């Protein structure tokens, strides 16, 4: 293939996306080039709008329009007494699509890890503030069954010790190393239904 700088750069960028390597990236780039008017123009416009207008809510971590309030927390149409804590937005979407949980979400933005992700980088302090401010009765820890996910869950539990809120975690049985977004609806349903208490509001 003749080296064209713009194409090579696009292949490099696309190959950075989750689950995509150089071969898959090349196929995607060829598809885009062969469908410029149908795909490239509208995609470029949409990406520009997303870059300009979509941000993370500083309180709960979900995505929101920078010109509107957050529908997950401040402008929610429903009032709940539960918060489900997840690592990232993909986990929130998976749980929402399964229709097994009705309540607020709190997106941490990652996990505490040895790779340099610190607890200060995550939205843990804002979670504690939400729990107190919104009179939350239960916090459900839905972090992944990885060392990093469990370490993060333990830290959150410790951070909530001074509150009267019940803290639960998804039931055991999640595959070790499994990430929430990769679980099927049946596994998620069982994990939520059989969740176990870590800290009760009588502690």
UniProtKB/Swiss-Prot annotation:
Disulfide-bond pairs as recorded: none
* UniProt GO MF annotations: DNA binding; zinc ion binding
Report the Pfam families cross-referenced here.
RecR_C, RecR_HhH, Toprim_4
Matching Gene3D superfamilies: 3.40.1360.10, RecR Domain 1
Which superkingdom heads the taxonomic lineage of this protein's source?
Bacteria
Give start-end positions of each zinc finger (C4-type). Answer: 57-73
GO annotation, biological process: DNA recombination; DNA repair
In terms of InterPro entries, this protein maps to: DNA_Rcmb_RecR, Rcmb_RecR, TOPRIM_dom, TOPRIM_RecR
Q: Which family does it belong to?
A: Belongs to the RecR family.
**Function according to Swiss-Prot or TrEMBL:** May play a role in DNA repair. It seems to be involved in an RecBC-independent recombinational process of DNA repair. It may act with RecF and RecO.
Q: What protein does this entry describe?
A: Recombination protein RecR
